[in-house]
C-alpha cells in the first residue's frame, strides 16, 4: 500500500516575501533534469509495469460533487495558461488521475508543472527534457518503451508522476530530496523551494461547502 503524501516531511514554512520571489524567479535559473542511474532488475520491472499500464482512464475523484468542485476551481486558476476549455479540462482530469494513481497530491503535481514547463505541452529544456513535466528522453529507453511520445499528454504525465514516485520511494518519503532528484539538483534548495512556493500560493485546494455535502 502506498503511503499518503500527507505523511511525507515537507519543507518548513517560508516567509511571504521569499514565496513571492521564488514564484516569479526566471525558470532558466533553475533548469535541470533527472539524471540517468542504472536500475536494479526489480526497480526496472516495477517502473516498466507502472508506465506500461494503459487501462482505460476512470474517475479518480471520490464522487461527482468533488469532481465538479475541483475541476471548476482549478480550471478558473488555469484559464490564462491553457485558454481552450476542452483542453484545460482534459489536462486537469489527466493530472488528477495520474497523480492519484501514483499516490501523489494533484496540487503538488500542478505546482511542479508550473515550475518545470509553465504548462507548455511542447516545452523542451536546454538539457532536452520534454513536455509538461519535463521528462528526460532516456526514461523511455530505460523502461523499454522507446516508441513512447513524451509530448503526449497522458504519456508525459504518466512518466513524470511515476518518476517522482520512484524518487520519493528512494528517499523514503522525503519530498525535499525527491524534488531535488527530479530536477537533477539534489541537495540544493532553490528548486524544491520553488515548487513548494507554487504549490502553496497557486494550487492549494480546500473543498467548497457544496462538495462537502
Language-model segments: residues:
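N-terminal secretory signal peptides that target proteins for export/translocation
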Residues: 1-9
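Short, aromatic- and cysteine-enriched interfacial helices/patches
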Residues: 8-11, 210
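Bacterial N-terminal signal peptides
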Residues: 13-26
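Residue-level marker of intrinsically disordered, low-complexity segments enriched
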Residues: 16-18, 41, 49, 80
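Sec/Tat signal peptide C-region and signal peptidase I cleavage site
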Residues: 27-31
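Short N-terminal segments immediately surrounding and downstream of signal-peptide cleavage
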Residues: 33-50
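Catalytic glycan-binding domains that act on GlcNAc-containing polysaccharides
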Residues: 53-213
